[in-house]
Structure formats: C-alpha cells, structure tokens
Amino acid sequence: MNALDEHPSAVPQGVTLLRRHAVAFFILGLLNNMMYVVILTAALEILPSHVPTGILAFVNIAPAVVSKALFPYYFKGEIWYGWRVWACTLGSFCGMMCIAFFPGLFLRLVGIGIASFASGLGEITFLQYATRYPHQVTTYCIGWFASGTGAAGLIGASAWWIVRPLGVRGGLGLLSLLSFGTALSFFVILPLPSIMSRSTDETTEALMQDSDREPERNLSLSFSDKVQLLKPMLIPYIMPLICVYFAEYTINQGVAPTLLFTVPDSKQHKLLSMIIHSLRDYYPLYQLVYQAFVFISRSYTSILP
C-alpha cells in the first residue's frame, strides 16, 4: 500500500505532487541503470570475439561499487545535488560516446568504466536526495525508484534489440542521448523538498506526517562513526543480500553466456527462428527474459498491488 492508498481523500495538489515524485523517480531509476543493461546486453558486439565477456562484466560493475563505497563513507558535509546530477548525466553520456566512437578495446573499457561510475554515483545521490522529503514521501519515492531500476533492465535490453541493426556506433550513440533525461527529470519534473514542506493543506499534511520524526540536526559523522553504524546491519541484512546478488550475477554474467544451442529451424520452431538467427542472439534474449522478471520483482511496492 502506498501513500495515495492510505489517504484517498488527498487534495488534487497533493496528488499531483506525489505523481510528479513517482514519474521523476521512476525515470531517474530507469535512466540511471539503463546504460548498464545496454552495455551488458551488447557485450558480444562491443568486445572482439577473442575477449571473454567477463572482462566487460567486471568493468561494468566495479567502478559503480567503488563510487557507492567511496562517497557515502569518505565524504562529509553538505551534498551538492545539482553538481552531482550533472556529473552523472555527463559521465553516462561521455562513457557511452567513448564506447560508440572508439573501436579500440582499451578505450571502450574506459568508456564502460566511466558510465559505470556515473551509474553508481547516481544511485546513491538519488536515494540520498529522497531522504530530504517527509518520511512517507521518501518511502514512496524509493519504491518508484526501485521500480524504475527494474524497468531499466527490460527497456534497456529491448532498446538494444531495436537499435542493434545500427551497429555499436549508431546504436549506442543514439541511446547515449537518453542520459540527458536524468537532468530533465531531476531539475524539471521532480518537486523541490521545500515545496512539500510549505504545503499547509490538512490532508496533504496527513499524507506526509511522521509523528516519530525528530527535529533536523546538522551532523557530521566521521568515517569511523559511519562504520560503527554499519556494523549492526552487516550480518543480519548486508551479508545475505551480498550472497543473493553474488549468486544472481554469477549465473547471469558467468554461466548464461556459455549456454548455447543450435540455431532453431524455422520448420520446427517458428517463433524462436524469428528471434534467433545466430548463436550471438542467445545472450541478448537471455538478458531480455531475465530483466523482465527483475522488473516484476522490483515493482511490488509501487506498480504491483
């Protein structure tokens, strides 16, 4: 149940603001993760035939992990969200353009790393920004952001299928323009936290009220302080999630590329023969099916009842 379900009598202004939050965070999650999926799905076209896809998979995720570990724990003080959003937008665009227009393996891996770092920075930035809203609005935004990251898999894999005939240069060059949708969504569609706090309508206030919320205080935590906060969550929450994601990505990126079958005959498998024309078509198809179910699993708090 989301915030709209809990307060069906919300005034039009409050409903409109929440819908803008939903649309904005869905787009932010979608575009932030979409390039990662596009690169992964296009792995066989991006890399030379003699290079294993595991190299691309590593470069596509390692910089994102570094950015997620670096920024929350080592940087203190006020977050400049505007600068971060532009850094994510331009980083994603430049990374994709580097992959598209430089045929050399090294420069393509550099481009993949830049796009990956931008994606990791974007994820923590948008989740941190969601906490600037009242509590119930924060959970509402995070639910739609998660749904957007799930849709990124489905739409990203589908997008590569559509632009694949254009080749790496044309296809990735065209998709790189979508990166600017991140800035558009953040600066134009997403309401400012100050707009939410100025609302005085009693129904809208009920929508955002959190009776347990303490007055805001400016805190500057050191790295050791943040580690102390992390320790109680490590065993019961973080380690199980690490195991789940490790198994998931091992299967998806390590095992799936090795599962190949003969090209289907049009007489025996009419539907599959329309989709699969060569052995290289299997992996993108695996990604499309996989990402479809990722979207379903990440939408149970927002879109799905």
Where are these regions (language model features)?
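Helix-to-loop junctions at the C-terminal end of transmembrane segments
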Residues: 63-85, 163-164, 290, 294-305
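Intracellular juxtamembrane helix-capping segments at the cytosolic ends
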Residues: 38-42, 112-135, 255, 259
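Membrane-interfacial loop- and helix-cap regions that link adjacent transmembrane helices
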Residues: 18, 22, 35-41, 51, ...
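Central mid-sequence intracellular linker of multi-pass
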Residues: 168-221, 225-228
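Cytosolic juxtamembrane N-terminal segment immediately preceding the first transmembrane helix
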Residues: 1-31
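Structural signature of the two symmetry-related core transmembrane helices
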Residues: 82-98, 106
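Hydrophobic core of transmembrane alpha-helices in multi-pass small-molecule transporters
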Residues: 26, 95-96, 103-122
